[in-house]
């Protein structure tokens, strides 16, 4: 049931581990995209990854999700070494990524779009599903019930029967987040989740993200250019500039770091 503590998971997922990025280096044809980057995402926290354009944020996200392979260094999610794993295998460990661009099937209902997130949790075989055996019907009912719980959690319960493409932009971004939550993730990678939104939409999505951390205990790595959202949500902030880590710590400390000020404003750092 959905309540003040959010929708409890219907799976027996193991505890959320830390994500440890250790001396991560990525080179592309001589270009150093990431240079010996090290940071740790503590379990159940929001960890913002920020920096000017070209700082290496997208490259880092692509390594974390298995799209790119690191030249050297490691990425560990608990006991699992992610470096070199395929995106599919990483997703199977409970890592879900939401891209900046919308990817909902526009003509499918919101409920069916969210149901796609349950795919990796489906145990019924193709034959049983095709024949509509009782086991398949029971599993589908359970998945749809979970979808409705998560839709309620993000504020989309009244829109489940609408085509996903008919939602407002902010609602579609919430639907993307809900679909990722339907995967029962332990780690969420959010790529600019409030980009292009109105102020009201940004506040709403930020509140849902905070609820994911506070109610569900899911770790979140957040790439976002809206510094107001970053400072409100993040427990820890890592700052990249030209592929190098220049700051890592609490938001208030990072915000006042001279190296960060210089990277963003081009001003001379003061002693």
Q: What would you call each of these model-derived segments?
A:
Residues 2-7, 12-271:
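Glycine-rich phosphate-binding loops of nucleotide-dependent enzymes
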